[in-house]
Amino acid sequence: MNWNAHGAKILDMIRNSKPLVHHITNLVVMNDTANVTLHLGALPVMAHAVEEMEEMTSIASALVINIGTLSKHWIEAMFKAGKTANDKGIPIILDPVGAGATSYRTETCHRLLEELSVSVIRGNLGEVSILAGLGGEVKGVESVSAGGDAVDVAKALAAKQNCTVSITGKEDVISDGTRTVLVDNGHEWLTTLTGTGCSSTTAVAAFSAVERIPVTAAACALMCYGLAAEIAAPQAKGPASFKVAFYDALYNLNAEQIEKGGRVREVS
């Protein structure tokens, strides 16, 4: 596959069709993820009330479930939205923020994965390792250690849950247990801003809304997301100016930039 050309094609499809991405996401990143959704060309909605979950999810093209700021009412909404998404064939993208940091988070993730059919799990190495049963350590929401390298961990959880797993880091790893893809795009300044991992989950959801092969959607999304960061970095003097430049780069990202700058390789 020509990953760069296909990524450009998917981005064009998003911009033309403007799919609705429903987020049940955390309070820290809500505004940022809404903006990233818009800059990619999709439409965001952040609805959390249990009373409207079925209706709102039914009109969406993808659902993000992000556990960053959990409460029992939000968990109820997650299950209701997730079951509606499964019934309607709408892809679910799960961001297990801080899984492993507390038993509440870890148990909630396991319940979600047991009761819902998730299309893509997007997390850091520690979170994914813990969910795969390989051990690891998460401090707050940051990965400290894991029970293996990213490729092995992604494959393990993908096989366990029968879904696609994306581990973001210096090099992004995407695997469905059979196919494994590496994305080398990105910039270290993404780590200076809170919520950039959560926003990458939003990118995966936007791409999943129009590309129904999860590995392809996730790899192309993370390629475009990382490439925008690379384009933005030379224009920035620090984290604040980088954020503005990054948003502009996402909004203005075009096929020529993607075809020249995307770095994706399939390793199995």
From Swiss-Prot:
Pfam families: HK. This is Hydroxyethylthiazole kinase. It catalyses: 5-(2-hydroxyethyl)-4-methylthiazole + ATP = 4-methyl-5-(2-phosphooxyethyl)-thiazole + ADP + H(+). Its cofactor is Mg(2+). GO terms for molecular function: ATP binding; hydroxyethylthiazole kinase activity; magnesium ion binding. The gene is thiM. Keywords: ATP-binding, Kinase, Magnesium, Metal-binding, Nucleotide-binding, Thiamine biosynthesis, Transferase. It comes from the Bacteria. CDD domains: THZ_kinase. InterPro entries: Hyethyz_kinase, Ribokinase-like. Catalyzes the phosphorylation of the hydroxyl group of 4-methyl-5-beta-hydroxyethylthiazole (THZ). Belongs to the Thz kinase family. Pathway: Cofactor biosynthesis; thiamine diphosphate biosynthesis; 4-methyl-5-(2-phosphoethyl)-thiazole from 5-(2-hydroxyethyl)-4-methylthiazole: step 1/1.
